[in-house]
Design a protein with these regions (language model features):
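Conserved PLP-binding active-site segment of the aspartate aminotransferase-like
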Residues: 201, 262-301
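Short, solvent-exposed loop/turn segments at secondary-structure junctions
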Residues: 24-28, 97-98, 130-133, 160, ...
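N-terminal "arm"/small-domain region of PLP-dependent enzymes with the aminotransferase-like
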Residues: 1-49, 59
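PLP-dependent aminotransferase class I/II
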Residues: 178-254
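Conserved core of the PLP fold type I
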Residues: 41-148, 159-176, 180
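Structural motif
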Residues: 124-128, 154, 198-200
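Conserved glycine-rich beta-strand-loop-beta hairpin in the small C-terminal domain of fold type I
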Residues: 240-248, 253-265, 276-281
Length: 301
């Protein structure tokens, strides 16, 4: 499976009349105003201090640095995990994050895709929970019940902060032999451009995963703003959930455990929303005041 050519622009031009689910175009102005990026303090002329970045993340997660691995976004972490498991077979619960499948296939892993857990009888399971396509999630207990069936389970929790269901198994991964949890700021604080992701697991897996890390895993800019962003995460997530509750209560939607809503039919907003291949109209969340500005007063769907 080939990736998108690196020399062709992947993203469509920004259109103020079209909501693009790949970008945070309706960005939360509250968050923008609170994050102060002073280039003079970023020290671009030296390599970033990864140890300090790890300490900031460790304090936020309340997890020992020896149980954490940082990468350039969740995608980098998942790629390294696929390298780590290159001699094993991997099952991927679909539909899901496309690059997980691409990485596995391009690295030569024996790959099996299925919509059903019962069909996946591989060494490794990759599970996005909540699912970034359908918005569905399974509970923490359901995830843990799968552990005896696989040598390893990778749980991608990029959307977990927005879930109605208690689904995160990050803390549980510290004390079991075969569980790795992937996290990201791309969704939790709407900052995909920073490319900051991490995973949590037992110390043995983390130590081995660190052996295949890049020479650096964080930029000076990310290091400079990380603590501010992490501190803003809870309030930002609360604002996004408030918007989701407002939309799902007013419009006909499929309940979503992610940072997006799935309208069953076109909600007739002032900005157009693309239709997904599943036939829904998907919109990434923004703050409620921004949403009301693009909402037609009489529109319900």
């Amino acid at each position: 499976m080939k990736r998108h050519p690196w020399y062709i622009d992947y993203y469509e031009p920004i259109d103020d009349n079209l909501l693009n689910l790949s970008n945070n175009i309706c960005y939360d102005e509250i968050l923008i105003n609170k994050i102060n990026v002073d280039a003079s303090l970023c020290n671009l002329f030296q390599y970033p201090d990864a140890a300090k970045t790890y300490n900031v993340l460790s304090n936020y997660c309340n997890i020992d640095v020896k149980n954490l691995a940082i990468g350039y976004g969740a995608g980098d972490i998942i790629h390294r995990l696929m390298i780590y498991f290159k001699n094993l077979s991997i099952g991927i619960l679909t539909p899901t994050y496309e690059l997980a499948q691409t990485f596995a296939l391009n690295l030569g892993l024996t790959t099996f895709n299925s919509h059903n857990f019962d069909d996946i009888k591989t060494d490794v399971l990759y599970l996005a929970n909540p699912n970034g396509v359908t918005g569905k999630a399974i509970t923490k207990d359901q995830v843990l019940s799968l552990l005896p069936k696989y040598k390893y389970i990778i749980v991608d929790e990029a959307y977990a902060d927005f879930s109605y269901i208690d689904c995160s198994v990050a803390k549980e991964s510290l004390n079991v032999d075969n569980l790795i949890v992937v996290k990201s700021l791309s969704k939790s604080v709407a900052s995909p451009g920073l490319r900051f992701g991490w995973c949590v697991s037992n110390k043995k897996i983390i130590e081995e995963l660190q052996d295949i890390r890049s020479s650096t895993v964080v930029t000076s800019i990310t290091h400079h703003v990380l603590e501010q962003l992490l501190n803003e995460c809870p309030a930002h997530i609360d604002r996004m959930i408030q918007t989701k509750n407002y939309i799902e209560n007013k419009y006909s939607c499929i309940p979503s455990n992610g940072n997006f809503v799935l309208f069953k039919k076109d909600p007739k907003l002032k900005c157009k929303i693309k239709k997904t291949v599943e036939g829904h109209f998907r919109m990434s969340l923004t703050d409620i005041e921004t949403f009301r500005k693009i909402e037609n007063d009489s529109a319900t769907a």
